[in-house]
Swiss-Prot record:
One Gene Ontology cellular component: plasma membrane
Top-level division of the source organism's lineage: Bacteria
Name under which the protein is recorded: Tic20 family protein
Keyword Transmembrane appears in the UniProt entry: yes
Source organism of the structure: Synechocystis sp. (strain ATCC 27184 / PCC 6803 / Kazusa)
Keywords, comma-separated and alphabetical: Cell membrane, Membrane, Transmembrane, Transmembrane helix
Membrane topology qualifier: Multi-pass membrane protein
S-S bonds: none
Transmembrane segments: 13-33, 53-73, 87-107, 122-142
Subcellular location per the Swiss-Prot or TrEMBL entry: Cell membrane
Length: 160
């Protein structure tokens, strides 16, 4: 779609900041990997206060979703660059939530807390980290982060 943009510094900053949400959502899947490789915990040191706030309130993720969707994605006064990145971060969060539900109610009852569950959690954690950091880097560079399928869904939801 659109690979380059004319995003100014403010748009780049806020677009990159929005991708902290998928990083926070991915934290719940990182338990196994963070125990095996404690050096990865460095990733979460800068956002630890946000992480504690986010998980302290049960409906924080839902409230943030509603606010981002209604106040940012659907607001035509905000640049398309920010709205697209907000929608993409929301979609990554939704995918992580759905994945968590599937693992909790389908995979774990069948396979237990074994290797399959641990592998799926590691996959979700690393995938979300990759998407989050890719989105941050692309936003800082002023480019649209083209993540297959997710970007297509984000483009279809964000009006020009």
């Amino acid at each position: 779609m659109a690979s380059n943009s004319t995003a100014d510094g403010k748009d780049r900053f806020f677009s990159a900041l929005i991708y902290v949400i998928p990083l926070i959502d991915a934290f719940m899947f990182g338990g196994f990997l963070l125990q095996q490789f404690p050096v990865l915990q460095i990733i979460y040191l800068p956002i630890m206060p946000l992480l504690q706030f986010y998980y302290q309130f049960p409906f924080a993720s839902f409230i943030i979703f509603i606010v981002l969707f209604m106040a940012v994605v659907r607001n035509n006064n905000i640049s398309h660059f920010i709205r697209f990145n907000a929608m993409q971060a929301i979609l990554i969060g939704i995918l992580l939530s759905l994945f968590g539900l599937i693992v909790a109610y389908v995979i774990q009852p069948v396979f237990g807390q074994g290797l399959v569950t641990e592998t799926l959690y590691n996959f979700a954690f690393l995938g979300a980290l990759a998407c989050g950091f890719f989105g941050i880097v692309q936003s800082v560079l002023g480019r649209y982060a083209e993540i297959p399928t997710i970007s297509d869904a984000a483009y279809s939801q964000v009006r020009f």
